[in-house]
């Protein structure tokens, strides 16, 4: 995991219990689905798409209508990212493309460190359920919690 603390920008390390902590003591629990909520916001409420919107998008994408596009994007991503390289999916939504990239890379015997970010907690939750191999976080693409 290459995540950094959204408060102090220190490196996050994961404890045996799954909590991500920075050197200054800020901590972030891993959700049961396997993602972290690293969104700092003074505004309460829902950010990004709500559960109903995300579920509707997943239902449509799972029909396969966009699978040829997803496969081609995944092939290009795997082809142009070096083995062991880092790939960021900013605005990963419910994980359709992120998961496809991961699967195409695995089928090509290529290891990619894939991080997905979305401002929608509902979307990231579904992405984490779709693919437990991904490193996912609720975060804003305007302030990505990732090390340079």
Predicted feature residues:
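Generic hydrophobic alpha-helical segments
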Residues: 69, 73-77, 97, 101
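Short, glycine- and charge-enriched coil/turn segments that flank and shape catalytic ligand pockets
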Residues: 16-17, 78-85, 106-109
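Glycine-rich helix-loop-beta junction characteristic of Rossmann-like nucleotide cofactor-binding loops
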Residues: 74-82, 144-145
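Class I SAM-dependent methyltransferase SAM/SAH-binding core
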Residues: 86-88, 94-143
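Class I SAM-dependent methyltransferase Rossmann-like catalytic core
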Residues: 51-72
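N-terminal auxiliary segments of SAM/dcSAM-dependent transferases
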Residues: 1-47
